[in-house]
């Protein structure tokens, strides 16, 4: 162990003390390898010219989809590699982009004066460092970043995040990972992770290829509504987001977008051939898996990493058309309690429905409410393709959509990338790739027949169930859990008992906890907790929003410093306000219709105080009301009220999924005419204040 006294940082008067163990090793400066093509205007013109004069007629005459794909990619790669070969660059970044040699020299001189004890010289140099830093930061923003907001907003936002230090990717989060409690060597990490991801589906039978071939051979002529127009493909290509990651085929979106006019016809032919024949080319069934840590740093490969599959952009375009056809058929069949990846439904709607049921039940103090939050283990990775195929047939999906969807999953391949390392490519026997459009849709089909007699909601794989009874040992929730276990065994799904939790809500006479029968799944008791985060919002056993408000306030407290950094860097106030709205206000307002009605005055003031503090940093000379006027912002309380009213207006529409929660006032049999301004909805008179915390009760009581 050694210690080192360093000069104060910035304008601080306090000296720094640096402590380190002798055995500590300094991590090397991060490096990353970037593979890219030089796609300037001249290169794009040359590529477009050669593609335009290629013999695509030969490709259009081919009946086999895989042969068409092979021809397309061979011609495309040959032309692109001729004019824009792939280049590799290794980048090293351990300094802020605005730092200059002069600035470093001043810092070294300041530190030398500090060590020598020359106080007057140190003060002079310290002031020079602080002044120069401020000038450099402001000049860097005005010269290199500010103009990007209009020309390239993505680069502007990336630069802003770099200034703040937001989401800095640090590969050290993948160090010291374990698999089955054994450490994994860094040099072998991608292969170990890929092998584990593939092994999750062990024991599940691969798709019965002969059955799929039989369905494919019996396909009728493709209906006209499933034939994609050349313009539709052109439009999809022209709308590609150039900032999105390049797929495993190494074809950049910038290339596809700029060549949309010349590529529309051959890509259209390839997609239509794929839909007609029910064959997805092998180039579209290969994924690069990127790992997203669920916590930082990640420790356990089994539970701390979320695999996201990056697929080729052309495959995504084909999926967008299939997604549309899927929705047209399944929207009328989807479970009314499924809110995930479904048109006109959201997490807020799911939470409103679930919380309304709980608040209504709690209005009767004798009721004992038990809420079960179910967590599926590797839900997407455990999808049995044979079970999925049968369910697609049972729901009478169009033949071409069924066969195409299953062909997309059959014999998929993936490799894992960690930093600049790629694993070997392995084949998958089960599951749906996360990050694709088809993944959530396929899981919705899998879980659509999972229904309960109790109140429940589903958001893709997040499932929550609540039982209400005057008997604290009511077995209805245990019966539901047993039914869930049977369903899982039948559908090759697994429940993560360790992450499945229960909350008990009761406001009547106290009940001896030792007399309460715990919920049991496969011989393991489900843990009872006082609070749980459901779809981003914390629920607790007291049915207050204390835990959730504390959670969002703690989360944004870490981000207020970013506002200070931007102001000090010289970023324009309007731009800082935009950043505030994106990274702070969005957190303070997430799902606000669910919890706004239950806020205390103090909690509302605490939330408003965050906006006051940020605006005080941006406009220190203005009062809060003056800052609101200058920025055009509304007070957060007003915004939450507007969100409540807007959400309720949508729910009042007869076709809204939550419209059934509204009760119309009974009409007078003697006078069926309703007075013009009479409010049409009513709610039972509340016995306690808890019912008034419900979104529905609040809106009706306030005559929204």
What are these regions (language model features)?
Residues 1-91, 169-172, 182, 186-187, ...:
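Surface polyanion/phosphate-binding segment centered on an Asp-His-Pro turn
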Residues 223, 419-420, 479, 494-530:
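Short, conserved micro-motifs composed of acidic
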Residues 242-251, 300-310, 349-393:
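Conserved catalytic palm subdomain of right-hand nucleotidyl-transferase polymerases, strongest
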Residues 20-26, 47, 65-70, 75-78, ...:
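Surface-exposed loop/turn segments and immediately adjacent short secondary-structure elements
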Residues 204-235, 279, 285-288, 327-374, ...:
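Active-site-proximal segment of RNA-dependent polymerases
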Residues 376-459, 468:
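Conserved polymerase palm-domain catalytic core
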Residues 92-195, 226-271, 276-283, 289, ...:
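Short, charged alpha-helical motifs in flexible N/C-terminal segments and linkers
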Residues 322-338, 361-362, 440-467:
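Active-site palm subdomain of RNA-directed nucleic acid polymerases
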């Amino acid at each position: 162990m050694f210690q080192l006294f360093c000069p104060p940082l910035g304008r601080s008067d306090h000296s720094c003390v640096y402590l380190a163990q002798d055995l500590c090793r300094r991590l090397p400066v991060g490096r990353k390898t970037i593979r890219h093509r030089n796609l300037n205007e001249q290169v794009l013109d040359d590529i477009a010219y050669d593609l335009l004069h290629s013999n695509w007629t030969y490709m259009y005459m081919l009946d086999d989809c895989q042969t068409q794909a092979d021809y397309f990619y061979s011609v495309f790669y040959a032309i692109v590699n001729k004019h824009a070969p792939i280049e590799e660059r290794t980048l090293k970044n351990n300094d802020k982009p605005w730092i200059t040699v002069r600035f470093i020299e001043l810092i070294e001189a300041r530190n030398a004066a500090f060590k020598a004890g020359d106080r007057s010289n140190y003060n002079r140099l310290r002031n020079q460092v602080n002044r120069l830093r401020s000038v450099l930061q402001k000049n860097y923003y005005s010269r290199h970043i500010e103009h990007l907001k209009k020309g390239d907003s993505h680069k502007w936002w990336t630069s802003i995040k770099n200034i703040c230090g937001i989401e800095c990717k640090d590969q050290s989060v993948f160090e010291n990972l374990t698999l089955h409690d054994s450490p994994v060597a860094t040099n072998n990490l991608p292969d170990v992770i890929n092998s584990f991801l593939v092994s999750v589906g062990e024991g599940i039978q691969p798709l019965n290829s002969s059955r799929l071939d039989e369905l494919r051979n019996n396909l009728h002529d493709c209906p006209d509504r499933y034939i994609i127009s050349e313009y539709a493909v052109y439009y999809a290509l022209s709308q590609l987001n150039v900032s999105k990651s390049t797929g495993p085929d190494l074809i950049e979106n910038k290339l596809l977008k700029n060549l949309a006019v010349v590529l529309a016809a051959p890509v259209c032919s390839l997609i239509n051939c794929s839909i007609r024949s029910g064959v997805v080319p092998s180039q579209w069934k290969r994924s690069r898996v990127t790992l997203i840590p669920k916590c930082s740093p990640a420790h356990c490969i089994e539970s701390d990493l979320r695999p996201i599959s990056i697929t080729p952009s052309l495959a995504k375009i084909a999926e967008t058309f299939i997604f549309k056809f899927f929705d047209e058929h399944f929207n009328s069949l989807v479970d009314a309690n499924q809110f995930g990846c479904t048109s006109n439904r959201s997490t807020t709607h799911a939470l409103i429905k679930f919380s309304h049921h709980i608040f209504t039940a709690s209005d009767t103090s004798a009721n004992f409410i038990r809420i079960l939050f179910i967590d599926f283990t590797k839900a997407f990775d455990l999808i049995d393709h044979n079970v999925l195929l049968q369910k697609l047939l049972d729901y009478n999906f169009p033949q071409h959509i069924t066969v195409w969807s299953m062909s997309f999953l059959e014999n998929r391949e993936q490799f894992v990338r960690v930093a600049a390392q790629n694993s070997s490519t392995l084949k998958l026997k089960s599951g749906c790739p996360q990050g694709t459009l088809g993944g959530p849709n396929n899981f919705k089909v899998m879980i659509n027949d999972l229904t309960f007699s109790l109140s429940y909601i589903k958001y893709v794989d997040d499932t929550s169930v609540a039982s209400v009874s005057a008997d604290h040992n009511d077995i209805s929730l245990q019966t539901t859990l047993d039914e869930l276990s049977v369903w899982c065994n039948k559908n090759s799904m697994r429940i993560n008992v360790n992450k499945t939790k229960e909350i008990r809500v009761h406001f009547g006479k106290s009940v001896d906890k030792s007399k309460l029968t715990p919920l049991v799944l496969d011989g393991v008791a489900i843990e009872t907790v006082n609070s749980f985060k459901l779809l981003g919002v914390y629920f607790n056993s007291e049915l207050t929003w204390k835990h959730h408000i504390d959670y969002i306030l703690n989360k944004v407290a870490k981000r207020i410093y970013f506002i200070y950094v931007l102001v000090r860097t010289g970023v324009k106030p309007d731009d800082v306000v935009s950043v505030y709205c994106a990274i702070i206000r969005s957190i303070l307002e997430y799902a606000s219709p669910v919890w706004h009605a239950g806020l205390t005055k103090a909690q509302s003031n605490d939330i408003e105080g965050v906006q006051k503090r940020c605006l005080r940093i941006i406009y220190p000379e203005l009062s809060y009301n003056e800052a609101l006027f200058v920025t055009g912002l509304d007070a957060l309380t007003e915004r939450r009220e507007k969100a409540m009213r807007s959400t309720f207006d949508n729910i009042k529409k007869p076709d809204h999924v939550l419209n059934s929660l509204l009760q119309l006032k009974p009409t007078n049999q003697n006078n069926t005419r309703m007075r013009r301004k009479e409010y049409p909805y009513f709610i039972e008179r509340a016995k306690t204040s808890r019912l008034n915390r419900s979104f529905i009760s609040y809106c009706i009581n306030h005559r929204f």
